[in-house]
Amino acid sequence: MKTKIFKNISILLSFGLIVKVLGLFHRIIITRVLTLDGLSLYTKMMPIATLFSVIASFSLGPTITQMVAKNITKRPYSNRDLMIKGFKIATITASIVSIIHLITNYFITHYLLQTDELFKPFIYFIPLYYLQSYTGIFKGYFHGHNKMNTYAIGQLIEQVIRIILIYIFITPMLKINLEDGIIACVISLSIGELIQNIFLFLCVLKTTKINNKTNIKADNKAIITTSINLTTSRLSNAICNFLEPIVFTFSFLKTGMDKVVADEIYGIIYGYVLPLIFITGFITTAIETAILPELVTHHKNNNHAAFKNIMNKALLLSFIPASITTIIFYSYSKEMLMLFYNTENGAFYLKLLAIPSFLSYFDGVFISALIAINEEKKLAKINLLTNFLYLFLIFILVQIPKINVMGLIISLIIYLTTSPIIYFFICKKRINYHLPKEGYILLLIYIISICSIAFFKNIIITIIIYFLLLLWLVINKTHSHHSLSS
């Protein structure tokens, strides 16, 4: 079992690294091609498009993962029927969302975003709602069967297509005007998604037997109920992302500042800073994706020890990218921005957000654990609470003249640190989960490393201290195992 989990994590990490590098390369080119003006407009659309996409996809991906994972052991219904009904539900929800999008397009771009240039580009997101919904179903199916490499290859193909399209499609369109260039960016997302869907569909037909012996039809009610619970949680985040630029711009303009400045600041934070902070997020995503089917199985079999053991190892693995990434970006904020985006815009914000983002790297493990024990409703409530708090803080703090833009940064810091702490205490209460002593030692190592940066002002000394402490932890743990064995 352990071998399977780490094999899946290794597969996802290997492909995830390649996909992330390609995705980063794609983002760097797009950022430089669009310039700050184009990037500000492009990032302004994304939260609303994401909101519509979340509703359209209806969380069918994780729902299918759960149901297929359970179906492997008990086979309560046909996998073939499960897939067919999933696609039908996805088509219906995507169609409803598309109609709503068309009806509200002018209102959103003119009144909410106050940017008429986005009227045409925003319409081109509609095909993406269908395609992302179908991709989610394929992803859920392959992950439920622990076929992690198939979906990973699909992602790899998608990124390659997007990069090719920059040169043969986006760049020529940008020469016409900025609006057509942004439209080309949106269309390229749909083309990449379409190619990935075709690949995954062929893999289902060729390598996967979805016609199992079970003739019991999948229950629409079971699919919809699970999807509603998961969607409620994701919807809360999507609505928050949707309202965030609106609330920020409104509060910022109340102080008498210019709208162009508001768009630029938002573009810097969400176009440069946050993508960099979570640049190694593919590692934690790979971990949480790989452990979910196993956690579901262990919970169903009442194997609590194995359940907690997987959580411990997943948190330990998440610590590595969390600590290294945040320390590097805290120490070299200007250098990192110059390296990736050829600009120092946002260096101050990157330095402020780097360390507080550390805890958010553990979100995924706790969320996977709570989903596995059927606590989707509680997850939705927590997300709703933290998102409301986040928007409320932006609304209040940004309007205070002495705080202004820093109100968004303060709100982000509180938001990034609150959720993982709440998730931890729920896991502690619900499954009697306790962080192992190694976890506390690692936290201490991280704190000492941060303090040493502040004291010595030298990252080299910090790295030496960091790895010496880690070495001490490994030696100490090995010695403890030998002592127990003897």
Where are these regions (language model features)?
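N-terminal membrane topogenesis motif
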Residues: 1-22, 77, 81-84, 217-237, ...
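C-terminal transmembrane helix end/exit motif
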Residues: 169-175, 187-215, 245, 413-457, ...
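Membrane-interface junctions at transmembrane-helix termini in multi-pass inner-membrane proteins
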Residues: 131-154, 355-385
